[in-house]
């Protein structure tokens, strides 16, 4: 109730706000957009391609409560590839284990911060893979086609995410 006194606008959950921002950027700039919101338990990926908005939630990839899922699904080698120091695998696993048993702690050393950044990169990578798998055109729909469409190999159910449209 106190928060409502601070604003004249309705308060909306973070995913709704981020989704609105992504849609507005795509609309105002007439571009394709990808955005992410990584939290403690989930990672949300938002995209607009060809004016079509999609949001996916990777419920098992976050930076605190589900950090063990990030490690399990990405593997220690994928996490290690982002680290530029000489942490041995045992030390790395111990530091990640500490984060698993104390998920809300904040990194206290530069090495701990780099490890969390490496895990964040992997959470984003895994979540984006899922997003591309779920952000697809409708399957099984009948499309009106011309004879020239016969030579176009696109099928229903393919991903809507086109990285070449992002102009990175």
Where are these regions (language model features)?
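Composition- and surface-driven signal marking solvent-exposed, interaction-prone regions
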Residues: 48-60, 136-143
């Amino acid at each position: 109730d106190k928060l409502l006194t601070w604003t004249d606008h309705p308060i909306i959950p973070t995913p709704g706000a981020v989704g609105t921002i992504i849609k507005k950027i795509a609309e105002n700039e007439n571009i394709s957009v990808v955005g992410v919101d990584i939290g403690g338990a989930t990672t949300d990926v938002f995209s607009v391609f060809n004016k079509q908005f999609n949001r996916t939630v990777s419920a098992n990839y976050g930076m605190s409560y589900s950090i063990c899922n990030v490690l399990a699904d990405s593997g220690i080698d994928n996490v290690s590839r982002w680290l530029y120091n000489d942490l041995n695998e045992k030390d790395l696993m111990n530091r990640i284990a500490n984060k698993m048993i104390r998920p809300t702690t904040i990194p206290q050393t530069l090495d701990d911060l780099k490890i969390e950044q490496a895990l964040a990169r992997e959470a984003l990578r895994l979540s984006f893979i899922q997003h591309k798998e779920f952000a697809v055109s409708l399957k099984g729909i009948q499309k009106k086609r011309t004879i020239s469409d016969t030579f176009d190999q696109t099928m229903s159910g393919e991903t809507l995410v086109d990285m070449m449209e992002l102009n990175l």
